[in-house]
Curated annotation (Swiss-Prot):
Alphabetized InterPro entries for the sequence: Na+/H+_antiporter_NhaB
Keyword Cell inner membrane applies: yes
Superkingdom of the source species: Bacteria
Similarity field: Belongs to the NhaB Na(+)/H(+) (TC 2.A.34) antiporter family.
Protein name, per record: Na(+)/H(+) antiporter NhaB
Molecular function as annotated in GO: sodium:proton antiporter activity
Keywords: Antiport, Cell inner membrane, Cell membrane, Ion transport, Membrane, Sodium, Sodium transport, Transmembrane, Transmembrane helix, Transport
PANTHER family found in the cross-reference section: NA(+)_H(+) ANTIPORTER NHAB, TRANSPORTER ARSB-RELATED
Cellular component aspect of the GO annotation: plasma membrane
Organism lineage string: Bacteria, Pseudomonadati, Pseudomonadota, Gammaproteobacteria, Vibrionales
Membrane topology: Multi-pass membrane protein
Organism in which the protein naturally occurs: Vibrio campbellii (strain ATCC BAA-1116)
Residue ranges crossing the lipid bilayer per the database entry: 23-43, 45-65, 90-110, 136-156, 204-224, 242-262, 305-325, 350-370, 392-412, 450-470, 479-499
Amino acid sequence: MPMSLGNAFIKNFLGKAPDWYKVAIIAFLIINPIVFFLIDPFVAGWLLVAEFIFTLAMALKCYPLQPGGLLAIEAVAIGMTSPAQVKHELVANIEVLLLLVFMVAGIYFMKQLLLFIFTKILLGIRSKTLLSLAFCFAAAFLSAFLDALTVIAVVISVAVGFYSIYHKVASGNPIGDHDHTQDDTITELTRDDLENYRAFLRSLLMHAGVGTALGGVTTMVGEPQNLIIADQAGWFFGEFLIRMAPVTLPVFFCGLITCAIVEKLKICGYGAQLPDNVRQILVDFDREERKTRTNQDVAKLWIQGLIAVWLIAALALHLAAVGLIGLSVIILATSFTGVIEEHSMGKAFEEALPFTALLAVFFAVVAVIIDQELFKPVIDAVLAVEDKSTQLALFYVANGLLSMVSDNVFVGTVYINEVKAALIDGQITREQFDLLAVAINTGTNLPSVATPNGQAAFLFLLTSALAPLIRLSYGRMVIMALPYTIVLAIVGLMGIMFFLEPATAFFYDAGWISPSSGDLAPVVSGGH
């Protein structure tokens, strides 16, 4: 019997998502205006934040852009925020949007070089613990100088390459055109290997993801909010590094120790080894690649290597906005490796553009947080505390908790502006402002690894095409991040409470840094 037109509309709404999920989204859309107009806009604002987090948590059921976008459109329509405020957030974060559009596509054109290097690393280091430490340390080191999103884009690109190589062979297909999203042709014998391989890749990706947070917190270029905080405080690269060190150094070493421990104890989804069959396939693939590599292929690797040097130098020296450097990578890589057809270039943009659209929706939610002043009670309560040491610890905790819920750049920006306003009003001293700036920076960067909401790199990983392939869901990410969340949050808090003030006094006495003075930068707005 043919489907009625009414049923067809219902069936088409959110496609293959479960019926209960569709009902939940419709319920949210009905409830929100009622709460906003009849109960309290503040409550409606927090309800919207909770609903948006729900859509992220259900990312494997339905990509969050559609349900989250419907909620955001309604929020603007009923007046929770304005189109102008959403546009303001997008303009304030244009660099992040450019990064996603161009840099991620640029990385795509360097895939051959990345796969070449990482195949050597993966096959060269047999110990899973050492391999995990290598991924975590490399991601941390790169994130101290590059953007965490760029680093995660590299790791995702490599993981997709590794996954598709094995999947092609396990499916009995030639290393040609193959759909690595379908498991139908895989035999039961290799299915166990595939599950173990997925667990292996999941753990490496999470180690790398946490590595971006460990490295990103240490320098002023590591995360977008670091730049904002450094700008507000008037610190340059060296001073920022030194002022953060009393907190970031203990956290970095404890993070690496945690990496080794979770692998050894095989807890929270870690500890999966690379199956022997998979290793053999990768070894065979590497051997085959070496045999069939022509001079033209070698020339491409050399070109990609030179472009990688340009990429790292340009990012470390901040020669241009990250996205524009990414555009230069696309132009150079395609020009010198002979990719000149439009359809060949189009594939490079497939990965990042859905996430770019999702991030725009996220900024609409951030606009609601700003317009409804959802964080104001927390900020006011913390600023009202008289004891300086307690205030430092509370700032760290409050930043951490809010960064788990919202975008950590937005949280950091809001807090540094509030603290700066307090300094201008004479509520706090310049010395206390400097210490609070450290608490804000570490508070937004470290505990935010708890959920994918806080770190854009984690959110990008969760919503990437790779996540469903290796069965990486929101819940699994939270569980796998848990040991790191506990260690990073507690060690960071200990650093703020016990190491920061004496270490800063020592740095002053040693002449490494001097007490800050002078004008502060103007107020900025921002999300991620």
